[in-house]
């Protein structure tokens, strides 16, 4: 039985105006993460978590759906402006940015942060199919 004197505090939602959308577009999946400027994650979504499996995960439409889901979840924080950081060579790069724009966010700048080696590790051998 609960004690009569205990009270639970109502959780206060913080309001964030500016945020950063990190889009990681690999050949197999697209991960969209929306955070504040300090890097605290507000929401995230993936193509696989949006109901797409197998080769449909790596389509531009799956990336669009994932970006819409992440954008709608981040709207609870009062987000208005987004910087977009795109990483990776996948097919969902452009469509994820367009979907975030369609969600009503003002996109202030788009940056490509794909890691490029300065002749680092040896790449894997070519596939023979």
UniProtKB/Swiss-Prot annotation:
GO terms for molecular function: rRNA binding; structural constituent of ribosome. Keywords: Ribonucleoprotein, Ribosomal protein, RNA-binding, rRNA-binding. InterPro entries: Ribosomal_uS11, Ribosomal_uS11_bac-type, Ribosomal_uS11_CS, Ribosomal_uS11_sf. Pfam families: Ribosomal_S11 (PF00411). GO terms for biological process: translation. SUPFAM superfamilies: Translational machinery components. The keyword RNA-binding applies. GO terms for cellular component: ribonucleoprotein complex; ribosome. PROSITE patterns: RIBOSOMAL_S11 (PS00054). Located on the platform of the 30S subunit, it bridges several disparate RNA helices of the 16S rRNA. Forms part of the Shine-Dalgarno cleft in the 70S ribosome. NCBIfam families: PRK05309.1 (NF003698), uS11_bact (TIGR03632). Part of the 30S ribosomal subunit. Interacts with proteins S7 and S18. Binds to IF-3. Belongs to the universal ribosomal protein uS11 family. This is Small ribosomal subunit protein uS11. It comes from Marinobacter nauticus (strain ATCC 700491 / DSM 11845 / VT8) (Marinobacter aquaeolei). The lineage of its organism: Bacteria, Pseudomonadati, Pseudomonadota, Gammaproteobacteria, Pseudomonadales. The gene is rpsK.
């Amino acid at each position: 039985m609960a004690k009569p004197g205990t009270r639970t505090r109502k959780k206060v939602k913080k309001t964030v105006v500016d945020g950063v959308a990190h889009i990681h577009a690999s050949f197999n999946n697209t991960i969209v993460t929306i955070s504040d400027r300090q890097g605290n994650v507000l929401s995230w979504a993936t193509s696989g978590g949006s109901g797409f499996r197998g080769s449909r995960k790596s389509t531009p439409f799956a990336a669009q759906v994932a970006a819409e889901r992440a954008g709608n979840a981040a709207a609870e924080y009062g987000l208005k402006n987004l910087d977009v950081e795109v990483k990776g060579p996948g097919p969902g790069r452009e469509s994820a940015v367009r979907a975030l724009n369609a969600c009503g966010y003002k996109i202030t700048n788009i940056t490509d942060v794909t890691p490029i080696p300065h002749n680092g590790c040896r790449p894997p051998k070519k596939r023979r199919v």
